[in-house]
């Protein structure tokens, strides 16, 4: 796992087309913005896990996708 430190307003790049920007920090919550092409699915982990379970792929463990 790559671990990075970013401040509010700073961005990181994933490949050539996906950006993740830190929008704000409040207590133990971090607001992030993700810009990605519409053909790239972006989900919170718990939503992704639910989608996989509904597809019958319930054997996907968190962090193993």
Curated annotation (Swiss-Prot):
Localisation: Cytoplasm
Coiled coil: none
GO CC annotations on file: cytosol
Molecular function GO terms recorded: mRNA 5'-UTR binding
InterPro entries reported for this sequence: CsrA, CsrA_sf
GO biological process, one term: mRNA catabolic process
Main location: cytoplasm
Gene3D superfamilies xref list: Translational regulator CsrA
Domain of life: Bacteria
Key words, A-Z: Activator, Cytoplasm, Repressor, RNA-binding, Translation regulation
Physiological role: A key translational regulator that binds mRNA to regulate translation initiation and/or mRNA stability. Mediates global changes in gene expression, shifting from rapid growth to stress survival by linking envelope stress, the stringent response and the catabolite repression systems. Usually binds in the 5'-UTR; binding at or near the Shine-Dalgarno sequence prevents ribosome-binding, repressing translation, binding elsewhere in the 5'-UTR can activate translation and/or stabilize the mRNA. Its function is antagonized by small RNA(s).
PANTHER family: CARBON STORAGE REGULATOR (PTHR34984:SF1)
Homology family: Belongs to the CsrA/RsmA family.
Quaternary data: Homodimer; the beta-strands of each monomer intercalate to form a hydrophobic core, while the alpha-helices form wings that extend away from the core.
Protein name: Translational regulator CsrA
Species for this entry: Vibrio atlanticus (strain LGP32)
């Amino acid at each position: 796992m790559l671990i990075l430190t970013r401040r509010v307003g700073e961005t990181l790049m994933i490949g050539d087309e996906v950006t993740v920007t830190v929008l704000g920090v409040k207590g133990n919550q971090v607001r992030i913005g993700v810009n990605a092409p519409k053909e790239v699915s972006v989900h919170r982990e718990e939503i992704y896990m639910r989608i996989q379970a509904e597809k019958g792929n319930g054997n996907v463990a968190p962090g193993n996708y």
